[in-house]
Amino acid sequence: MKIDTGFYSKTITPTYDSDAIDRLRYYFTVFLLTSSAFFIMAKQYVGQSIQCWAPKQFKGGWEEYAESYCLIENTYYVHMNNSNLPGPAIRENKELKYYQWVPFILFGLAVVIYIPRVIWNALQSLIGINISIVTSNLRKVAKSGFTSENPDIEKKKKEMQCKKKATSRQVDGEFWGSRLTTCILATKFLATILIFISMGFLDYFMGLGPMYGWTITKDILQGRQWQESGSFPRVTFCDFQVRELGYVNNWSLQCVLMVNMFNEKLFIALWWWYALLAILSIFDIFRVLFRFTIHHQISFITRILACTGDSAISATEVGEFNRKVLRIDGINLTHLVYANATIFEAADFVRPMWEQFKENQN
């Protein structure tokens, strides 16, 4: 369904074209990821994220060099009950390979979760409608205090009436009125898939196995600290070589990885947040699919039309109005207006089409 948006022609920054769950993904989550990335980056490269216990012969810049090397290269965790350090092969398997890359991974996750938003904006342009402009100008009209007796407003409302040629295309004898709904479902499916992919990537990236957020949370609730579990260890070891007078000396330093204290809290919270987003996103998809039911369509539009002051509303008429004029695209567009404004703005959006429909019926 293609609706004439000439009445809502003033362009503003698009912010009113998504529902609450979309905004949780595309705005709040992106802000959470980017702000966390900047915080961790500042802690790593501006503050002191690692301190190593160096021997006495490390004088001058040696200790600083060792700490910089251990920060850039991987450190590894050894349980304090182990009296000896493991062999080289075992050390490599115990390396912590994530802490240097945390800021970049967070930035990457922010980009990934914003991809459906970019696609949604592109699809709106492709189908020829800007929902943000529709909703925003409805809000402006509501805030301006205009009444229905104002001839200018009546003129503008007539301009936005949904005519048959403007609301649908005929393809092989059938009206095409589900393009907007298809785009909505496609972006929501994509967003949900990307959330699960991001959770799987975090499980792999942290090297703590699947469902690491649940596992670490259970450990914390049971009083099992990082010294026992090895999750996000604060004390690690680092190996490096120093060439002195033609000899290569191997050193193993014990280091305090302070940034892991923040990483633990951040990635546990992030895992649970993504789990919540996954549940909400699945619910969101089923909510859109539920709008295909005739009962919901009639109930929803009847509630919207009740705000127009029309007392003569029958379920049969509303059903015909939905089938012939709004169809599923109109239903979903009205839902988006309602989600970003109020029921009264949604009623202002539907009223001209309803009045035109009743005139045609008579």
UniProtKB/Swiss-Prot annotation:
GO terms for molecular function: gap junction channel activity; gap junction hemi-channel activity. It is a multi-pass membrane protein. Its main location: membrane. InterPro entries: Innexin. The chain crosses the membrane at residues 27-47, 101-121, 189-209, 266-286. GO terms for cellular component: gap junction; plasma membrane. It is found in: Cell membrane; Cell junction, Gap junction. GO terms for biological process: monoatomic ion transmembrane transport. Keywords: Cell junction, Cell membrane, Gap junction, Ion channel, Ion transport, Membrane, Transmembrane, Transmembrane helix, Transport. It comes from the Eukaryota. Belongs to the pannexin family. Structural component of the gap junctions. This is Innexin-17. It comes from Caenorhabditis elegans. The gene is inx-17.
